[in-house]
């Protein structure tokens, strides 16, 4: 939904008059959660309602201000270390055991068939993926480590069995096992598919550039399937008899991101591919609401020869499933079944269909739990699922045994404790449909969550029309907002209190629902898993929860700085050039709107190489630097360069493909700086080729 936030601000939909809110002491947590129930139960005049909302907004601004005064912005923990254990990935080890990844706790866990934890092993570098080879070796990868760890299972415990070095790689986001002990790994930062032979003298057999935002990889017989989130594509590669990656066999390309897929080989050698993603249609903002961003599942068939073809597609948002990330495909006896659960909603679907037929699937719907990030079919017919939102593993009974709900197995970690209940509620508002519970999928209207456009809080690779004039903008990350105000490219939201109020309005726009609404917890029983036991959650409590979450929804640790404490010679020169040419706008501040928070040059390395990487690299002013069309009459608010490498495409209008392209376009003199469209003026100069590489190397660290 914070398509809402990112789009509203970037796009410039001013939903309410900007106000300066008073700064007094915040109300108590319990008062916030109970606020406004009485007034909603009693008739009020419009003036009374307006007064109540204004008073609530003052209290919310108060709450934010008090938290801001108490916050050490240099040491605000990265989000990947402050939101619980985060069960994230699963793989089958043998008939009685599974292995899983706790992304938040950065650990590998051994599980029994009931998903009870038998062993936990810490993994350096933020564990994210696990794969089991045909011989039973277990490999685990981390987002900020250039090595894979290998374990062997002795029947009771996982035993360390060495590691595989991957020089030149910042980290791995996904893993799959291949024939003959080979591995396939996706490097998110480099956008590469690595073919690895752990037993070889040169373990990296090939590093192939595949595209932007690779998030998952799976081998299906002699085919390898890769999901490129930011390129909005799923690619099918051929594998030779030795398991080496060959030619691209097929590509599915959509207008928006594909969040997950599954695939199965049919008896006649055809590949059945199921993909889950946003509606294959441009985002439509022309009517004020977020149009054509429903969640869909798509079914494709790839014959042994010839091109891939779509069999059918189904809008699952209208059936109650939003942002499905882990579709699970079953094929048996000439029939197919697709299990789909949403990350952003509390329903699941079973779609029954003939594997080669374009006929619509028969749909069976069931209540479920939100937050599903991974799913794995078990020999028992049960389904094991990873649920970072609820910080739990889930075990769904086998098909036909739905009298019992899914079993919830909570997971905790001392080093990454669960967030406060209020903050967890805010996380649910961000990642589920709670912020706009009455949206529909009628016409171009959509049921969505913030994550529909901001995958895991970052971006979706889109450049979309704002619905205003001829302004097109790239999606912006929604992490790190607390110290980066005024918010968004138009800078119309002075603080998170204003942001939260506007987001409830824009998220539900078009649903004819008053954005000042309450939630009855009986309609969302899973809220109890977050520690929410209030019978009713009033509008102020909901906004406060969203603010509390956004305050701590910081950026993850930058993989480029892990294990380091100083610049290379190239990065040092880049830092000096940045200070001379860029830092007057992209200031080294810990709070973008507080000039006094800027760090001196000699303090940059310590801040950059810290786990927090807290410098915002922004300021609160508007600038006109040639990146057009401008989103505001005064230009565009200076954007944050924090984790610039995680955002693609670059610039507000998405016109730069790489960071070095962004740097090479720059033209400047002692008083002026243009990112694009510089006037033909001989006094303006560009960075030299060496300087451009040096500045880019520095930007990679931010």
Residue ranges: model-predicted function:
Residues 151, 232-233, 237, 246, ...:
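Periplasmic c-type cytochrome electron-transfer domains
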Residues 4-433:
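Predominantly soluble domains enriched in secretory-pathway, periplasmic, or organellar proteins
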């Amino acid at each position: 939904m914070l398509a809402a936030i990112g789009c509203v601000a970037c796009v410039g939909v001013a939903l309410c008059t900007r106000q300066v809110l008073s700064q007094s002491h915040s109300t108590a947590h319990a008062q916030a959660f109970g606020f406004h129930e009485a007034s909603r139960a009693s008739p009020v005049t419009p003036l009374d309602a307006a007064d109540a909302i204004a008073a609530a907004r003052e209290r919310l601004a108060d709450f934010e201000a008090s938290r801001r005064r108490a916050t050490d912005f240099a040491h605000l923990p990265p989000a990947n270390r402050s939101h619980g254990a985060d069960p994230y990935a699963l793989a089958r080890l043998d008939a009685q055991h599974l292995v899983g990844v706790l992304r938040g706790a950065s650990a590998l866990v051994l599980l029994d068939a009931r998903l009870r934890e038998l062993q936990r092993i810490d993994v350096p570098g933020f564990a994210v993926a696990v794969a089991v080879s045909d011989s039973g070796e277990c490999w685990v990868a981390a987002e900020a480590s250039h090595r894979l760890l290998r374990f062997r299972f002795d029947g009771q415990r996982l035993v360390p069995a060495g590691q595989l070095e991957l020089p030149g790689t910042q980290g791995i986001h996904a893993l799959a096992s291949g024939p003959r002990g080979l591995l396939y790994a996706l490097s998110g930062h480099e956008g590469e598919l690595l073919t690895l032979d752990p037993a070889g003298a040169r373990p990296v057999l090939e590093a192939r550039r595949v595209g932007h935002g690779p998030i998952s990889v799976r081998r299906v017989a002699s085919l390898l399937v890769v999901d490129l989130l930011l390129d909005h594509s799923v690619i099918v590669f051929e594998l030779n008899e030795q398991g080496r990656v060959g030619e691209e066999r097929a590509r599915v390309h959509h207008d928006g991101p594909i969040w997950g897929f599954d695939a199965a080989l049919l008896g006649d050698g055809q590949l059945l591919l199921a993909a889950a993603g946003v509606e294959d249609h441009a985002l439509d903002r022309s009517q004020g609401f977020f149009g054509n961003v429903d969640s869909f599942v798509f079914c494709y068939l790839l014959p042994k020869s010839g091109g891939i073809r779509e069999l059918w597609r189904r809008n699952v948002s209208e059936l109650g499933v939003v942002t499905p990330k882990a579709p699970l495909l079953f094929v048996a006896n000439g029939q197919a079944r697709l299990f789909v659960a949403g990350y952003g909603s509390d329903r699941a679907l079973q779609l029954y269909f003939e594997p080669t037929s374009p006929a619509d699937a028969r749909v069976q719907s069931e209540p479920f739990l939100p937050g599903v990030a991974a799913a794995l079919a078990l020999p028992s017919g049960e389904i094991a699922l990873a649920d970072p939102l609820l910080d739990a593993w889930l075990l769904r009974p086998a098909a036909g045994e739905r009298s019992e709900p899914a079993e919830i197995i909570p997971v905790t970690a001392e080093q990454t404790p669960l967030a406060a209940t209020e903050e967890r509620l805010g996380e649910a508002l961000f990642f589920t449909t709670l912020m706009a519970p009455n949206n529909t999928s009628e016409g171009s209207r959509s049921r969505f969550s913030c994550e529909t456009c901001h995958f895991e809080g970052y971006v979706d690779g889109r450049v979309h029309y704002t619905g205003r004039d001829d302004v097109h903008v790239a999606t912006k990350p929604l992490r790190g907002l607390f110290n980066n105000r005024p918010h968004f490219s138009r800078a119309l939201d002075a603080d998170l209190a204003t942001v939260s109020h506007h987001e409830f309005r824009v998220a539900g726009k078009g649903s004819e629902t008053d954005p000042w609404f309450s939630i009855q917890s009986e309609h969302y029983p899973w809220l109890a898993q977050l520690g929410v036991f209030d019978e009713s959650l009033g509008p102020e409590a909901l906004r406060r929860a969203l603010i509390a979450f956004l305050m701590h929804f910081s950026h993850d640790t930058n993989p480029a700085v892990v294990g380091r404490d100083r610049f290379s010679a190239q990065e040092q020169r880049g830092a000096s050039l940045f200070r001379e040419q860029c830092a007057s706008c992209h200031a080294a501040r810990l709070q973008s709107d507080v000039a006094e928070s800027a760090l001196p040059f000699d303090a940059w390395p310590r801040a950059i190489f810290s786990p927090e990487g807290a410098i915002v690299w922004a300021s609160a002013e508007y600038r006109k630097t040639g990146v057009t069309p401008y989103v505001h009459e005064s230009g565009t608010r200076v954007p944050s360069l924090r984790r610039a490498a995680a955002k693609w495409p670059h610039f507000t209008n998405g016109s730069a493909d790489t960071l070095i392209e962004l740097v090479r376009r720059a033209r400047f003199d002692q008083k002026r700086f243009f990112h694009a469209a510089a006037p033909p003026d001989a006094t303006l100069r560009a960075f030299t080729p060496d300087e451009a590489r040096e500045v880019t190397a520095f930007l990679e660290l931010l």
